[in-house]
Every structure is written in C-alpha cells, then in structure tokens.
Amino acid sequence: MKRIIFCLCSVFAANISFGQPATDIYLFDLSIKKDKVSISNPINITNHKGYDNQPSFHPEKTIIYYSSTNDDGRTDIRSYDYKSKQTKSITQTTEKEYSPTVTPDGQYLSCIIQRDNGAQDLGKYPIDGGEPIVLIDNLIVGYHVWADNSHLGLFVLGTPNTFHYYLLPMKKDATLGENIGRSLHRIPGESAISFVNKASEKEWVIKKLQTETMQISNLGTTLNGSEDLSWLPDGKIVMSDGTKLFYLQPDKGQNWNAVEIESGANVLKGVSRLAVSANGKKLAVVVTE
C-alpha cells in the first residue's frame, strides 16, 4: 500500500467494485422532537461523478467520512468537514476501502480493506495519517460495528451471510445468526447493537443484541424491501422507502411515521444508506445521482 496522504457497518460481495451505483451524499439539517422528526436544507457534500457512499459521522467533530471512487475506479476514504466545507482524501491506496468508522478510542478509522485476491479484511488507519493495521484477516468481512473497545458485530460473507460477535484481543469469534442485512449499528444509550434479519421473504426484522447478556430480541419490522437504517439519539429508528423517510419508536409500537421534509424532497431519489450525527442535528442521506 502507499502511504495515506491526509488526515470510516461495507461490501456485499468480493467484487463490489463491479457495477457500483453512481451515488451522492446529501447533508440535511435534522430536527428531533417527541412526536415529530423533520429535515431541511440539503447540501450535496460530494458532487462527484461515481460512487460516494457509506457516510459515517465523527462522534465529536463536524466531519463525515465516506467511501468514494477515484479516477482509477478504486474506492478510497474521504472526509468532509461541514463547518469549514473542506473535503480531504484520507487514503490513496492500491486496495479498496469501505465502511469508514471512527474507532471507540477516537484514534483510528476502521474500515473494510478489499484486496484484489478477493480477501476482505478489517483494518484501521490512524485518523491523522499513517500505515494501516490489520485487525481481522481470517474472515471475509462485509460490514462491521464497534460494540465497545474490544468487541465488534460483523457481517461475514458466505452462503449464507452470517452475523458474528468478535472479541478482538482474544480473536474469539461467535456466530449468532444467518441471513442478515448490511445495516449494523450501536444503539444509543445502551450496551446493545442492532441488525436486520432477512431470513423471511415476507418481512425483515430489526433485532437487538444485548451485549452484556448476549440476548437477542425483536424491535420491529423494516419498511417493505428496505434494510438501511440509522438511530436517532432519543431511540427512534429512521429508514427510507427510496423517496420518503420514516421513523419508528420501538418502545411505542410498530407504526412507521413519516419524517416531515421541510425542503429538499426533490433530491430524495433512490435513497439507501443513512447516518445521523451524535448530537442529532445532521442527517446524511445517500441518493442516486
């Protein structure tokens, strides 16, 4: 690999680079109230032909990390500071990087490193620049989420795709489920992570893994045919049906409620991945170009 130039849960198959959709990332202002969620003032933060996807917020800074194709068709990690409106390249390598995520200690960006031989390792780059450190290279990792400093939830590619809970220091791996979706998240305010079970063709189920007890419970069903979700700081779940946004309050029933779109409805086309800032004031939305 070449050195990083400056200063992150994602891959469906070993050859994700083929046929990647042309996507952009819009940043909306987000308002969260007890019984109302609204978005407004969208800004295209990528405005770049090709694949710009998998947004992830820094937990404290006004920075979004995302995956973006370069001129050679390979995917690198970039960042956008929505205060200074500056874009930077984080990696420029001979590999492909996906799913950039700030590690719990705030010192690194963990990501999927896709290699030309078909391997998909989980690695991390120093957040201010440096050489990568490989964390997991014995599994074909598609997506990841940090439960804490030493535990991760993993989407592992296979037949079928499986959900793993991985203890990093001991390299201890437990398989907890099959046929899961790509959307893995730590649940705000809880020692828990969420994932989507896609075993049924009729409906997909949002599930919660309590990491202290290792108990798995159901939170609700997804919107029909949708698997990408994100958590709001107050415990609501937000999803899209492709053109509109909805939210669910798992502790108050199974009804999806419409997110009010105060401005920017025209840019919401082919909506897929979503990301919410830690303070709940910004929403990143991936759309088709």
Segments and roles (model prediction):
Residues M1-P21:
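Bacterial Sec-dependent N-terminal signal peptides
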